[in-house]
Structure formats: C-alpha cells, structure tokens
C-alpha cells in the first residue's frame, strides 16, 4: 500500500528562538522520517516545512502544537497545505 505524500507549512510563535527549537524539530523530524526544513523568521517565529507520509507529517505538526521541546514555549501554530517548489531529501535547518 502506497501512503499519500503531503507537505504542510507551519509557522510557530512564542518563545521559540534561541532555545534549540529548530534543532529539536529536526531531531523529531528525522525520527518520524519526514523531510523539509526549519528556519527562524524576522518576526520571532519559526517557519517549518514538513513533507512525507500524511500520518507522519500530522505527528510532527501535533508535536509542534504540543509545545515542541521543553526549552520552548509555543503560543500558537498556524498551518496550511503547501506545494513545494523543490523536493527535500532530508530535514534541514535553514539560516
């Protein structure tokens, strides 16, 4: 059975910069087998692109909404389906 592959863009707000949020997100993504990236935004948030099997993508989004790493404080997570302009073969931290 082939699982559907999807991509979701998430924007995470709260105390999420300078607390290892991108690295923890990358570690969680690698465990789930999803690809994409995490990068800090100028407005203090973190942008996360997650691509992979729908169930695994949803698990990472749920992890983000649950607060991510203990060092962070997540106030809100906005998500929308995304059609990437390129494919990702790993989960990267962008600068």
Swiss-Prot record:
Task: List keywords of the entry alphabetically.
Answer: Hydrolase
Q: State the Pfam families in the record.
A: Acylphosphatase
Q: Domain of life here?
A: Bacteria
Active-site residue list: 22, 40
Disulfide bridges in this chain: none
Record keyword Nucleus present: no
What top-tier enzyme class does this entry carry? Answer: hydrolase
In this chain the Acylphosphatase-like domain maps to 7-95
Q: Which GO molecular function, any one, fits this protein according to its record?
A: acylphosphatase activity
Catalyses which reaction(s): an acyl phosphate + H2O = a carboxylate + phosphate + H(+)
Family label: Belongs to the acylphosphatase family.
What is the protein name given in its UniProt record?
Acylphosphatase
- Organism annotation: Klebsiella pneumoniae subsp. pneumoniae (strain ATCC 700721 / MGH 78578)
């Amino acid at each position: 059975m082939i699982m559907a592959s999807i991509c979701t863009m998430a924007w995470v707000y709260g105390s999420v910069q300078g607390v290892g949020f991108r690295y923890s997100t990358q570690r969680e993504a690698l465990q789930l087998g999803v690809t994409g990236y995490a990068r800090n935004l100028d407005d203090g948030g973190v942008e996360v692109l997650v691509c992979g099997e729908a169930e695994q993508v949803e698990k990472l989004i749920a992890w983000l909404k649950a607060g991510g790493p203990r060092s962070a404080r997540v106030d809100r997570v906005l998500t929308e389906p995304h059609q990437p302009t390129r494919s990702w073969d790993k989960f990267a931290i962008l600068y």
